[in-house]
Amino acid sequence: MPYVNVHGVNLYYEEYGKGPAVILTPGGRVDRNGLRPMAALLSPKCRVILHDRRNCGRSDVVIGGELSEQHLWAEEMAGLLVQIGAAPAYAAGGSAGSRTSLTLAVRHPEVVKGVFIWEVSGGPRSGELMAPGYYGQYIEAAERGGMAAVAETEFFAQRMQDNPSNRERLLSMDVQKFCTVMRRWSATFAAPNPVGDLTEAQLKTITCPVVLFAGNTPDEVHHVSAAENVLRLVPHAEMRPSAWTHAEWDVIGQHDHTFPGIAATNRYSMKATVYAAELLAFIDRVEGSESAQAHATVTQAVGVK
C-alpha cells in the first residue's frame, strides 16, 4: 500500500491518471472513498491524488503538534505533494476539505495552482456546533475510561481496523496529553473565524485562483456566509451557484430534517458529475492562461511582434 512519511506521520494515498495534478480532500474526518466517483471522472484528464489525512482512514493516528489539526492537515498535504512530485497541484474538496484546501493555499502557495471548493464550512455557529463531534466526545471518553475508552469509540475503533499500527500509538498515549491537545484543537476549531480556522487576514493572502460554490439554507455548519466571506476576502475568487436546488437540499442537506443516513460523503458522490465538470473547466482555463503567458514571455524575449 502506498504511504509517504511527512514529519513523522505516515499518510496513505492513491493516485490515478496523468495530467495536471489534483488532490481531493473529503469532509469531516472521513476517508478518501467518498471522493472516488469524482476521482474516476477526473482521471482521464488529470493526475488525481486521493489521500487520508492524519487521524483519518488508513493514515496514522497522531494526536500532537503545535498547530491546529486543520493547519497540520495542510502542512502534511504540502509535504505529500512535494514528496510524490505532484506540486504545484489543484486542491479541491468539500467542508473540511474546503477549509484544508484554503489553508494549504495560505501556508504553502508554492504548491497550489488553484483551489476548488464546495460546502465551505464556517459561519456564526459552525465551529461551536462541530467541536463536540470532532473533539469533545473523545475528551469525555478519555476522562471517563482512559485511552481504552477512546479506543472503543466507533471512530477510533475504525482507525485501528483500517491501520493496525494505530492501536499501539493510541493506547500508549498519556491521557492528560491527549486531553490537552484535543482541548487546544477544540478551542481553535470553535473560534469565530470567517472560514474554519482561518482569519480574514490569512484569507486575504491567498494569491491563486479560487472557484467555490455558494452555500445552502438551512445549514449552520456550512453557513452561506462562509462562501460569501471567501468571495469577499480572497482576491481571485469566483462563486458558482450551489450544486443543489432548494428542493433537493430540503431532503438531502445538512440540517435537522435530513433524510436518514445521508452524510456528506453521500452528497459529494451524488454531485460528482457537476463538481468534476466545473473543476475540469477551471483547470483548462488556468492551464490555458499559463500557456498564453509563457508564449507571450518567449515572444517578448526574442523580440517578435
Indicate residue ranges for each PLM-predicted region.
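Catalytic active-site module of serine/aspartate enzymes centered on a nucleophile-bearing elbow/loop
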Residues: 236-305
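Conserved HGGG/HGGXW glycine-rich cap/lid loop of the alpha/beta-hydrolase fold
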Residues: 5-61
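Flexible "cap/lid" loop of the alpha/beta hydrolase fold
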Residues: 99-107, 113-143
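Active-site loop/oxyanion-hole signature of alpha/beta-hydrolase fold enzymes
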Residues: 50-92, 258-274
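Hydrophobic, aromatic-rich cap/lid helix
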Residues: 171-201
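Conserved alpha/beta-hydrolase "acid-adjacent" motif
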Residues: 219-226
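Catalytic nucleophile loop
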Residues: 93, 97-98
